[in-house]
Design a protein with these regions (language model features):
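Long, compositionally biased intrinsically disordered regulatory segments in eukaryotic proteins
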Residues: 1-124
Length: 124
């Protein structure tokens, strides 16, 4: 399954908008910033004060499996951080499938990143 950066932007913005409704713009922005893993490619994702995410590059490029893993790690950390403020935050996101890409790439098993990697490895 091939995803483009623009697919990630759409999914991340859905998650950001949902979080913004619960946590407010300031906390959502801080959560995105504080949970971003130290991976240079992720620095291309910019978040403005209204918590809209953009990408400073070619959004029609395909995303590699390695890049998807970094996005998954970031999303997992972001949701776990939000769960410290809102009870059942991760459960609500999972049940409503907020920001999910086709095949559940971003949010399926958000509470267990290692399970996600294991399942994807078995499928290959």
């Amino acid at each position: 399954m091939v995803f483009k950066i623009e697919d990630l932007i759409i999914a991340l913005n859905q998650l950001s908008k949902f979080s913004n409704n619960f946590l407010g713009a300031t906390l959502t922005l801080k959560n995105w910033q504080s949970t971003r893993p130290n991976f240079d490619w992720l620095d291309n994702f910019q978040i403005n004060h209204s918590t809209e995410m953009t990408f400073s590059g070619v959004v029609t490029e395909s995303v590699t499996a390695f890049q998807l893993q970094w996005i998954q790690e970031w999303v997992t950390a972001f949701i776990n951080q939000g769960s410290q403020f809102i009870r059942d935050f991760s459960t609500i996101i999972e049940q409503k499938r907020i920001g999910e890409l086709q095949g559940g790439i971003l949010l399926s098993r958000v509470s267990s990143y290692s399970s996600w990697l294991t399942d994807k490895t078995k499928a290959v």
